[in-house]
Each structure stands twice: as C-alpha cells, then as structure tokens.
Amino acid sequence: MLIPFTKYQGAGNDFILCNQWESEPLTRRDTDLLARLCDRRFGIGADGVMFLRKHADYDFEMVYFNADGREGSMCGNGGRCIVAFAYHLGLIAEQTHFLAVDGPHAARVIRSDWVELGMQQVAEVEQGDGFFFLDTGSPHYVTLVDDLSQVDVVRQGRAIRYGDRFREKGTNVNFVQRQGPALTIGTYERGVEDETLACGTGITAAALVSSFLPQGQPAKQDYAVPVRAKGGDLEVRFAWDGERFTDIWLCGPATRVFSGEIEI
C-alpha cells in the first residue's frame, strides 16, 4: 500500500505529515511502522510523525508521534508545521483553533512560511539547585550554562533524562546560554533520544525561565524573547500576571520540504 506524505520542518525540527481528513490508513497501533518511517536510513527520516484529522468541535485535530513511534506529548514546532500543512491544503484560514494532546490551541499563519502558535498557560515552575523544571505541553528540565559550545548535549542530556528522578517517564533536557536579551539553546529530546535542531516546547520553557533572571521572579509585564536553536531563530512572546504565564506564543518558521509516497 502506498501512503502519501508531506515533510515539513520548523527551524530544522522535521516531521512527516499524513493527511487523514478522509481516511486513516495509519493508526496509533502502528508503532513499529511509524518508527521506521522516522528512521533516517531505512525510512523517510524525521523527528516525528503527525496525523491531520477532522474534529467535530475544532478546525482539526493534531495527533503526534515521537520518532520511536509512540504517541507523544505536545510538540510546539510540530504544531506550527501542521498548521502550515492544513493551511496549504486549503482546510483552514489564517486564524485557526485545533485540538492537540494537551488541549486546544489557537494559531495564526502570518505568511506562507511563518506560523505563530498559542501555547497553554503555565502556572508551576520548579526552581531547583541549578535547574528549573516546568511543563509547556511537554516536561522540560532547563539549566543555564556559561558556554553552550562546551556542553555535550547528548551525553549530559541523556544522563539527566535517564537519571533516578526522570528514568520512568523521562524528560526533555535544555541547556541555555543567555546573550543579552536573547537565548541560545541545545535540547535533548525524549522520544527522539537525541539532540534535535530545535524543540518548540523546550524553546518556550527556556524563554519562560529567562524571565526569572536575574531578580528571581518574573515581573508583571509582556515579554518577547528571541531564541536561537541549531536549526534557526524563533521568538517566544508571553506575559506574567503574578500567578502564571499567559498569552504564550511560539513564533517561527514552518516550511514544506517535499511530498511523496512510501510503500508500507
């Protein structure tokens, strides 16, 4: 059977997108097949797979799978890419609302290759000894470093992800360097089990964490934080109302790479 697909990338975070608007040839049970599609030597190659599906109450539903073939938590760059995909298919307008695993999301297509994604509010941020831990749709461990170029993201990230605290469920691990108002980030992603060129929920987590510095508590104001990942530049906009982070937007590129068919 031939399965049509389209490949998208958001700042180098790449995804296989399957239009399941009318039929569902692939399902959540196809774990091994989905993992094989993500394999960069024996498949198409990607950080994850997404199904675009109809939904009765939203413009569409996003179903996301990690590169290991298992259904994953929210993927920020994936969310931006699937919005671009649906827009290019003519299924949605520039302003849209869709459903993901962590709940509803708003999004807007600013231009054909730039999408802004509304993220869930964040109320709980753990401040540990040299790290922050928070959930921006996916769990993220964030630690600040003086020189990101000296960090072995894979080795150090894997040690934290498989450490005693996170061994059972795992976590994404982010190493963040501040450079004035901007951030540079390296992320080890759970489910991919490797460093990725960008991680949208990790970039969001890093931007929120940056508002704690240097005073130790965010100010009641609007923020716009530029973040540079290995795969490109993004921006996170948000506000702090004294109790939680609100009006969070992950803004960045979402670009079609190619379309094709693969036999399964």
Describe the residue ranges of each PLM region.
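A glycine-rich beta-to-alpha transition motif near the start of alpha/beta enzyme domains, typified by
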Residues: M1-R111, V142-I264
